[in-house]
Amino acid sequence: MIFSALLAVAVIPAGHSFLCTPTRVWDGDGPVWCTEGPRIRLSGIAAKELDGTCSDGHPCPDTDAISARDALVRLIGTPIGQTREGHILVRGPSMVCQSGGSVGGNRTAAFCV
């Protein structure tokens, strides 16, 4: 069942499916902002932060952060601009995502196709 009423929910509860139409991307594993409301961190993807660092206890890939972010943007849509803060604006098709619950910072961990 697709979880509705997303605009009123900051984090999608674990186990729920939901739609995400991407509107902007921060780095190679998210967050990805969705038209439907949630910000998601893509589960199963390891990417450096934009400053080149890696989080403690997480894999630290060799790929630089900008290349990883740009690859994610191409994967989920078409870049259409950039915000003053550095978010890449995207236009892409809706993805069906499965929530893994909260990963902090009002973000939902999710696998999406």
Where are the model-predicted features located?
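Small beta-barrel nucleic-acid-binding modules, primarily SNase/OB-fold domains
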Residues: 2-113
